[in-house]
Curated annotation (Swiss-Prot):
Residues 1163-1181 have a biased composition (Low complexity). This is Inositol hexakisphosphate and diphosphoinositol-pentakisphosphate kinase 1. It is found in: Cytoplasm, Cytosol; Cell membrane. Residues 915-998, 1131-1191, 1389-1436 are annotated as: Disordered. It catalyses: 1D-myo-inositol hexakisphosphate + ATP = 1-diphospho-1D-myo-inositol 2,3,4,5,6-pentakisphosphate + ADP; 5-diphospho-1D-myo-inositol 1,2,3,4,6-pentakisphosphate + ATP + H(+) = 1,5-bis(diphospho)-1D-myo-inositol 2,3,4,6-tetrakisphosphate + ADP. It comes from Mus musculus.
């Protein structure tokens, strides 16, 4: 009746067809037409185009809902499917017409809201039998909170403890209420205040929260938002006496609620908002909308989203989550609900709904439609070596962004009040104390004021200098009129025999004194607005490292990552040290990377993990190692000589022959003379500032970042005082501060026009280029020793990250065709970002340069890379070291070529002097595009800047365009003007992308270009010295794609001209004057150097063995015992077998699901077959049922990541490394508990399918890996589960692999029993699994502890015992969650790899439990990685 009779061009305008009785409504909204206007249009076109079948999608809801903005936006997009026609039933029709008169439709989207006749909708669905998006009968249940809670409970979904009070005369036994002063007893269940009282009707939003008298009593009354209020406080403390209610525990959520919106079981969007219970004030933005911000769901929460969607049979469903005490609880299910104001969500939702409808209904109409198989579904990309590989892991270590100058003051304090403060905050436990919180700084300020008051009364000559410092301490702490822990920090270090010679002017050693404290005050160093822009833009550029973004979503840079991320196939963790500038840099980067909006604070809270309590990214620069003291003394001695540098000095100061160092020394010539010049220039500068302050016109002058001339003068005056000591000698340690300050003023305060700053910058930079890198060691050996002292924990964590990726995903995978078709969530990318300070970046680079990664005499590529690094004079803000791990599934699983590692580097922000960095090696695909590259696949171009452009037969030297890569997102006209459902779009965009960033030479056939370049282009992130970007980081730059498409291969010359930009601007993050730049307001923000490839032909084995060797070599005798656990594990990992996937378990061929009678919520495939709708979890096709279960390691990986990444990282604090003082540290070295011993005892009991394992440690991984094979069969979809296993796996290499075999023996039986019990329908398969995976593998599975409480907890605790840095709490939470997961063991049944039936109903169980498995892993990952529960003493 309502079908289209012509094939209209619907790509530009969405068509809405309105049912009778709503003509007046048909004219509103973009693209909406009345029935009459459409009829005329159809008549006009009827003769031109033969009729095509149409699927009619009916919208049956109240007008307020069907015409809402979200619905309109989604329906507009839905109409872009060629064969879908939308019909909106008018409210008059719904309310007044009998259902027989309602328009017929093939698919019905109908949902209840106030006043909606649900009965009529149910009758209509029975009459017409349309395909229902949201089940109608279940909507009756959603209106009753009692039924909602009952269903949630049946599904095993966590919800707060509750009791129902039914005031029903027919059921007096359910109406027992005893109210006390601070508690209420409902039907025998006692609820102490605070508790929540909810009406049983879901339509009644008058929810009350009752507070205990100790907190003041009263209640908070929540209601539907009225204006700017959502609740009000009432002094009434008595519960309501009429009506039926649900009483439940109040969950402490830290003031935020999470609202989750599902679109099918495999997609969920989550937003956090201020809890209405907090103060009742609705936070609104400038447009009057409630402030919400997107959040990441944990794996367990993703599982909950799926289960809610399936249990209530609502494809589109919203529900509320409470995050409390490390758990997530569902407290409300709202039914049909859309996200407001999220274009991304509208795109995704329409695509998922459209694909769901097409999948179910298209076959009936013989409509040609198939599941789009896009390259984005698997992160396969061309690497820089030209081969097609799957991106598995990205590890980046990034320095913070542009900051204000750091300032520091040291003073010795001996007053008892300081000692009392030191003791109060636990300083004696570690000998050090950091005070950052406002209340702590207030205590310091109070003591300072008190001492100054005493000094005024009793001045003593001998402490005059201290008086000045106390005054400065007071003035700094009083700055801004309030405390912000990010801006200032006080450190106290205990010296039992008095502080040694101070760095602030005293050259002679003092005699040993009574105990004293060294107080170090640090201020400044805040991230500037420019620093935020740099970080956010770099985050945007980093998106382009990730694959995908084809088809309808190729409209803006980096959307492949966003799709990967929103569909839960991106395992992202961001770590930052505890410095405010570092944390804010990480938050700004995350904002750009994930296209988040709003302020940085909520992003920081939600996304950035603080790694400060374990030394992972922090370093105590005030406690130098003996090696650093020696180096510093030697450096100061050489630079105090008033004579030109001679050959001896060059030998002493630059034994490594660093090009940049030699250049700087040639500029300096005589260090003392240069210091004299620098001092004179500083004096001149302070004189100019004082003069400027006398100028009346400069009284209210505001400098950059709200600095005043007075503060600027203080900054320079302090440097002037400190640089030249009383003895006339210069304090070389102040040179970096001088360079820091002058660089800041030249860049940000250039408008002042101060004289001499350019010369001061030139000279101080030359000095700093000697002092800064040489403070980290002069000889190669010193550099490595100091470097490992700084970043040993980080090295261990990087090693862990690489091996975890390798271990949990290295088994044989599904054929890419199947995986693409089902959007396998196992195809995920693991990203670990570490934001830190200059010391860690210098140190890590030193390890790679001087640690012996490769022999430069044997490797020409590495030799040129070292030459490039040698020419780098400064590791500026936003310096990046990036490690990318690829897997080549075409290689033999045991081959070393299976895993491919690339090492990239960028020196960060460009200096004030353009071109101050050398021409890099380029982000080079050493692909086989010509014979020369074939013969030397590992080579890189010379450092000669002109070489690339002189070789036209190589990939073109194209430079990124700022507008598309790092500017604001733009949609591609090619894509957006076509229908989203059109397969032609997919093929066209695929073939039109000539290799993305790789603009190939004309000799390359277009077909080959298509195969090699799965991504499109992004600007700036990758060096164009050799070619215009990374093919291992396909980007999404429309410019290259759309223009490139129009140019035939023969016109590459013109394309080269079209895309070429001068090299100096190739990462134009903020060249505001560039006409194409998207960031117009940041003209002062320097651009960032692109990534250069240091090496693109490393194997995982090489890198892992190198990192292991470095960590072992620098482990001192004291830490040897505890390090044995870690190191032995890595020795195992370095053996032949572990670095390639082990023996594989063959899984039956997968079958794509045929159209089924099942509703969409039972769909085993993903809701959307396009990247945007990728599964949130392991829900692939029914083929999932072929997956076998994994060994315990899969569960424990995440534990281990933390334990090793955080706990064991601290094991070896020798040779300058920082020792983490944690209680129970001794337990680390107790040999009795070391899993190292376990392999010998337990290996013989390895699982079936694994070759009999000998007692050699090397065999252990073989157990793991077959387990992984089994695991991966289910574990692939559970990409997160492997994380957990590796986490514990890394800690106790054998604990997971063998400990489980041993310790979990008693659990094995239970595994089988509960599996069988909980999976009655799959009883046979459950037993089959237990037999097949073997009891022993089942025991390894005990990482999903079957006993929810004690057993699981005990087992996990046993495993966790050797690394106590992480306290028990996370384990307990983990064990409960994992236990819950294990109870849902249908996963295990379905995961049995021998189950051939792919379409059985048990399929759903499989998917859910795979998800559960995944959930646990990520849950653990997140909980344990945060490590916030570390004991306070560990935090110092």
């Amino acid at each position: 009746m309502w079908s289209l009779t012509a094939n209209e061009d619907e790509s530009t305008t969405a068509h809405f067809f309105l049912g009778a009785g709503d003509e007046g409504l048909g004219t509103c909204g973009i693209g909406m037409r009345t029935e009459e206007s459409d009829s005329e249009l159809l008549e006009d076109e009827e003769d031109e185009v033969p009729p095509e079948p149409q699927i009619i999608v009916g919208i049956c809801a109240m007008t307020k809902k069907s015409k809402s903005k979200p619905m309109t936006q989604i329906l507009e997009r839905l109409c872009r499917f060629d064969y879908l026609t939308v019909v909106i039933l008018g409210e008059d029709v719904i309310l007044n017409e009998p259902v027989e008169n309602w328009p017929s439709c093939h698919c019905l989207i109908s949902f209840h809201s106030k006043g909606f006749p649900l009965d009529k909708a149910v009758a209509y669905s029975k009459l017409r039998n349309p395909f229902l998006i949201n089940d109608l009968a279940m909507q009756y249940y959603i209106q009753d909170r009692r039924e909602v809670y009952r269903i949630l409970q049946e599904e095993g979904i966590d919800l707060p403890r509750y009791a129902v009070l039914n005031r029903d005369p027919a059921c007096p036994e359910e109406c027992s209420l005893i109210e006390g002063e601070d508690q209420v007893e409902v039907n025998g269940a006692v609820f102490p205040k605070p508790f929540v009282e909810k009406p049983v009707s879901a339509e009644d939003h008058n929810v009350y929260i009752y507070y205990p008298s100790s907190a003041g009593g009263g209640s908070q009354r929540l209601f539907r938002k009225i204006g700017s209020r959502s609740s009000v406080y009432s002094p009434e403390s008595s519960v309501r006496k009429t009506g039926s209610y649900i009483y439940e525990e109040f969950m402490p959520t830290d003031g935020t609620d999470v609202k989750v919106y599902t679109v099918g079981p495999d997609y969920a969007h989550a937003e956090a908002r201020k809890s209405p219970a907090l103060d009742g004030k609705v936070e609104r933005d400038s447009e009057g909308k409630e402030v919400r911000y997107p959040v990441m769901l944990t794996a367990m929460e993703k599982l909950v989203a799926r289960k809610v969607c399936v249990a209530f049979k609502q494809t589109v469903c919203g529900f509320d989550l409470l995050r409390a005490n490390g758990h997530s609880f569902v407290c409300d299910v709202n039914g049909f609900s859309f996200v407001k104001n999220s274009m991304k969500y509208y795109d995704d939702c329409a695509k998922i709904l459209g694909n769901t409808i097409m999948r179910e209904l298209a076959p009936q109409f013989q409509i040609p439609w198939s599941i789009p198989t896009e390259a984005e579904d698997i992160p396969i990309v061309p690497t820089t070596s030209g081969t097609m590989m799957e991106l598995r892991c990205v590890i980046a270590i990034i320095r913070h962004g542009d900051r204000t100058p750091k300032q520091k003051m040291k003073m010795e304090v001996t007053h008892p009040r300081f000692f009392a403060l030191f003791e109060k905050h636990g300083g004696y436990k570690t000998g050090k104390l950091k005070l950052k919180r406002p209340e702590q700084l207030q205590e310091v300020l109070d003591i300072t004021r008190l001492l100054l008051a005493e000094l005024e009364k009793e001045p003593e000559a001998e402490i005059e200098e201290k008086t000045g410092k106390l005054e400065q301490l007071k003035s700094v702490l009083e700055m801004y009129g309030h405390f912000s822990g990010i801006n200032r920090k006080v450190q106290l270090t205990y010296y039992p025999h008095g502080v040694k010679a101070s760095n602030e002017g005293q050259d002679l050693q003092r005699e040993p004194l009574a105990p004293s404290l060294l107080l170090v005050l640090k201020w400044g160093g805040e991230l500037t607005p420019d620093g935020r822009v740099q970080a956010e833009e770099l985050g945007r550029a980093f998106r382009c490292m990730y694959p995908g973004g084809q088809g309808d979503y190729a409209g803006f840079p980096g959307c492949g990552l966003l799709r990967l991320h929103s569909t839960f196939r991106h395992d992202l963790k961001i770590y930052a040290s505890d410095e405010g500038r570092v944390q804010m840099t990480a938050a700004a980067f995350a904002k750009g990377l994930l296209a988040l909006e709003g302020e940085l604070t909520p992003i920081l809270v939600q996304m950035v993990k603080s790694a400060n309590m374990n030394g992972l990214l922090d370093s105590d620069s005030d406690s130098l190692s003996s090696c650093q003291h020696r180096v510093k003394a030697r450096l100061h001695h050489i630079l105090q000589q008033d004579a030109p540098f001679g050959p001896e000095d060059y030998d002493q100061l630059a034994p490594t022959g660093s090009t940049s160092l030699l250049n700087s020394m040639s500029v300096i010539q005589n260090p003392v003379k240069v210091c004299d010049q620098v001092f004179a220039l500083i004096e001149n500068l302070t004189h100019q500032i004082r003069e400027r302050m006398q100028d009346p016109s400069s009284v209210d002058l505001q400098l950059y970042h709200s600095e005043t001339l007075e503060l600027m003068l203080q900054r320079w005056s302090k440097l002037e005082r400190d640089f030249r000591q009383k003895s006339g000698r210069y304090d070389i340690s102040k040179i970096p501060d001088i360079y820091d300050c002058v660089k800041y003023d030249v860049q940000h305060n250039g408008s002042l026009g101060l004289q001499g700053t350019a010369e001061l910058l030139r000279l101080s930079k030359a000095l700093a280029d000697v002092v800064i890198p040489q403070e980290y060691g002069i000889s190669r050996e010193e550099k490595v020793e100091i470097a490992v002292g700084f970043c040993l924990p980080l090295l261990r964590k990087i090693l862990l990250d690489l091996q975890r990726t390798h271990e949990d995903e290295s088994v044989n995978k599904l054929h890419p065709l199947y995986s693409r078709g089902v959007l396998s969530p196992g195809r995920h990318v693991r990203t670990r970002l570490y934001f830190t300070s200059e010391s860690h970046v210098h140190s890590l680079l030193s390890v790679f340069r001087y640690g012996g990664l490769l022999d430069e005499t044997q490797d020409a590529q590495w030799q040129r890379a070292l030459a490039y690094l040698s020419a780098i004079s400064e590791l500026n803000y936003m310096t990046q070291i990036v490690i990318m791990l690829y897997e080549d599934n075409t290689r033999d699983p045991l081959s070393e070529e299976r895993f491919h590692v690339e090492l990239h580097f960028s020196p960060g922000v460009k200096g004030v002097e353009e071109g101050s960095a050398p021409a890099g090696c380029g982000f080079r695909p050493a692909s086989s595009e010509n014979e020369e590259m074939k013969t030397d696949p590992g080579s890189i171009e010379n450092l000669c800047p002109g070489k690339a452009s002189d070789e036209p037969d190589r990939a073109l030297q194209t430079s990124p365009q700022p507008v598309e890569g790092t500017g604001l997102p733009r949609r591609s006209p090619l894509i957006r003007n076509r229908k989203a459902g059109s397969m032609e779009v997919l093929s066209e965009t695929s073939s039109s992308r000539p290799g993305g960033y790789r603009l190939f030479s004309s000799s390359r056939p277009p077909t080959e270009m298509k195969q090699s370049g799965l991504g499109s282009q992004c600007t700036g992130l990758f060096s164009t010295t050799v070619l215009g970007g990374s093919s291992s980081a396909p980007n999404l730059q429309d410019y290259a794609r759309t223009h490139g498409k129009k140019l035939p291969p023969a016109s590459l010359k013109h394309r080269d001209e079209l895309l070429f930009v001068p090299a100096v601007k190739r990462f134009s993050v903020s060249f505001a004057k560039h006409p194409t730049n998207g960031f117009e307001g940041c003209s002062m923000v320097p651009t960032i150097y692109p990534l250069e490839t240091l090496h693109n032909a490393l194997s995982l084995r090489q890198v892992s063995e190198f990192l292991t060797k470095v960590c072992q070599r620098h482990t001192d005798a004291h830490a040897q015992a505890s390090a044995a656990l870690f190191d032995s594990m890595h020795n195992h990992q370095a053996s032949d077998s572990p670095f390639s996937p082990p023996r594989t378990l063959h899984s039956p061929p997968l079958q794509l699901r045929h159209r089924s009678e099942k509703p969409p919520w039972y769909s085993s495939g993903p809701s959307s077959t396009v990247s945007s709708a990728g599964p949130s979890s392991p829900t692939t096709v029914d083929g999932n049922s072929h997956f076998g279960f994994s060994d315990q390691s899969s569960v424990n990986i995440h534990m281990t990541e933390e334990k090793q990444g955080f706990g064991l990282l601290q094991e070896t604090p020798g040779d300058g490394t920082r020792e983490l003082h944690i209680e129970r540290q001794q337990e680390l070295v107790e040999p009795a508990q070391s899993p190292q011993e376990l392999p010998v005892e337990i290996c013989p009991s390895g699982s079936q399918g694994v070759t009999k394992v000998s007692q050699t440690c090397q065999e252990v991984p073989d157990i793991v890996q077959p387990c992984h094979n089994i695991h991966e069969e289910i574990g692939q979809p559970q990409q997160e589960v492997p994380d957990i296993s590796q986490l514990l796996l890394k800690d106790h290499d054998t604990t997971t692999n063998t400990c489980h075999l041993c310790q979990a023996s008693q659990l094995s039986q239970k595994v089988c029993e509960e599996i069988c019990q909980l999976c009655q329908d799959n009883h046979e398969e459950s037993n089959q699994l237990c037999q097949e995976v073997s009891v022993k593998l089942g025991r390894m599975v005990h990482g999903f502890p079957v006993n929810v409480d004690s057993t699981a907890q005990e087992t996990l605790m046993e495993i966790g015992r050797p690394t106590q840095e992480i306290p028990e709490d996370p384990y307990q939470e983990f064990s409960v969650k994992v236990g819950v997961l294990a109870q849902k063991a249908p996963a295990i049944s379905e995961l049995s790899q021998d189950i051939p039936e792919a379409d059985k109903p048990s399929q759903e169980l499989s998917e859910e439990t795979e998800l559960q498995a995944q959930e646990v892993s990520e849950e653990i990952d997140q909980e344990s990685e945060v490590v916030d529960e570390l004991p306070p003493e560990a935090i110092s």
